[in-house]
Swiss-Prot record:
Alphabetical list of InterPro entries matching this protein: ARPC1, WD40/YVTN_repeat-like_dom_sf, WD40_repeat_dom_sf, WD40_rpt
Pfam families, sorted: WD40 (PF00400)
Protein name: Actin-related protein 2/3 complex subunit 1B
Superkingdom as given in the UniProt entry: Eukaryota
Repeat in keyword set: yes
Organism: Bos taurus (Bovine)
Function: Component of the Arp2/3 complex, a multiprotein complex that mediates actin polymerization upon stimulation by nucleation-promoting factor (NPF). The Arp2/3 complex mediates the formation of branched actin networks in the cytoplasm, providing the force for cell motility. In addition to its role in the cytoplasmic cytoskeleton, the Arp2/3 complex also promotes actin polymerization in the nucleus, thereby regulating gene transcription and repair of damaged DNA.
Gene3D superfamilies: YVTN repeat-like/Quinoprotein amine dehydrogenase (2.130.10.10)
GO biological process: one example: Arp2/3 complex-mediated actin nucleation
Amino acid sequence: MAYHSFLVEPISCHAWNKDRTQIAICPNNHEVHIYEKSGNKWVQVHELKEHNGQVTGIDWAPDSNRIVTCGTDRNAYVWTLKGRTWKPTLVILRINRAARCVRWAPNEKKFAVGSGSRVISICYFEQENDWWVCKHIKKPIRSTVLSLDWHPNSVLLAAGSCDFKCRIFSAYIKEVEERPAPTPWGSKMPFGELMFESSSSCGWVHGVCFSANGSRVAWVSHDSTVCLADADKKMAVATLASETLPLLAVTFITESSLVAAGHDCFPVLFTYDSAAGKLSFGGRLDVPKQSSQRGLTARERFQNLDKKASSEGSAAAGAGLDSLHKNSVSQISVLSGGKAKCSQFCTTGMDGGMSIWDVRSLESALKDLKIV
């Protein structure tokens, strides 16, 4: 486990480049900062400034090396590296509320933006007119779209929203891609087709994620539940009411294992038994370390004033938390190995820090932990 504190401000979202040498983060404002690893330090190398409102989503396309950002100014920008400068291209989303999340499709020919306008904007590049255009998925979304994730085929799109639903839509754009092959979620996939809709959640759906082969989708809700739908089992949904505070992010690390994190400030493991069709709690992944009590240095006292509005000792300042992160974890991303066999994953949080977790090290450190 490696932890780096970038900022005093919260990190609202992040994205990695292809070779994981650079990370783009938003310091909870209208800017995006790109850091590069230099020895044991992270050095800021670029600053992207174009949004007028807070940046709410970042995604970095690995092959085309383009960054897409969205924000509360209701716009998205596609950033292209020309020389040593990132150049933005405005994408008109045709929404009247804040954009909340953005994701490149795996084929990188389009991206999806969820918003408070109760629509999902599917944006693609029109070569003839040399601009980005978008189509809207509207029905039956009834509230803000908080999270998105693409199926590996770049056609199906999972969306979690504030109407307590996780849905899967077809985002097939005939102008830029071939007709999709049938999937376990369905064979007819015209644009905007609803392929799946959950009914088991009772809270805002904060995070959603497809498995590596796309036959399973998992989501976490504000009622502290974790759910998984299996298309190979007639879209049967397994639901687990966790004992944690609400989870904000989730990702598959194998076909049957999930890592989620949120307001408890540490990642937790969930496993899925396909034979029984059940989810189970696999354990906490952040091992608490026993540390001796000591006084605060002047530097720590001022950091606590900035981060936690407290200058008191460890218990009052949140330093008494035995987790690596000292505030809510807002995002999880797979670093290496992919969703099928993840070997490393990354978390960023409201404490302004970033942690890199090694799956094998976690397994050896936690005797009862088994990742299947």
